[in-house]
Amino acid sequence: MKGSKAIKVGFIGCGAIFSHYADVIKNHIPNISIVSVCDMDETKRESVESIESAKFYTNIHKMIDQQKLDVCFILTPSGVHFEHSKICLNAGINTFIEKPITLKIEDALELNQLAKENGAVLGVVYQNRFNKPIKLIKQIIDDDLMGKRILTSVRLFWSRNNEYYKG
């Protein structure tokens, strides 16, 4: 992709998962630049300081108005995914949301319609490609350390407390 312009990325929400996204983008994906991060909590500014190209905002509308984003990732609590995604999609910004897309099916359908109307891509992030256990399993398979595989089944158990789902 030599000569192509960098994709300008913004984030809304910089809780625990944000550092994983920032690491993957900085270390594994060429031609992408984190230009802005928004979180209502001013103390989260510290988590953004190591990203030289990023400007920190506490107001979503101000970030959207001042930055010409190609993509925005919604990493906020589940209860506000709809509100934040709607702002981005109405601005014609390609939007990727951490799971779940919304808490109500009607809201998810509305976001899908907004994406179509505004020529934006809407996606939900479900992959675990860069999780350490998944990378280890992939390496074991690639190194053929398991022998002939007949069937593989994986179950992932984790729990979230109520704070995770509040919005």
Language-model segment annotations:
Residues 1-51:
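N-terminal Rossmann-like dinucleotide-binding module
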Residues 8, 33-34, 68-70, 94, ...:
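Structural signature of beta-strand start/N-cap positions in the alpha/beta core
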Residues 21, 55-114:
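Beta-loop-alpha module in the N-terminal Rossmann-like domain of NAD(P)-dependent dehydrogenases
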Residues 37, 72, 152:
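Receiver (REC) domain switch-region micro-motif
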Residues 80, 100, 123-129:
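Rossmann-like NAD(P)(H) cofactor-binding subdomain of soluble oxidoreductases
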Residues 110-127, 147-152:
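Rossmann-fold dehydrogenase core element
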Residues 128-167:
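Predominantly a Rossmann-like dinucleotide-binding segment in NAD(P)-dependent oxidoreductases
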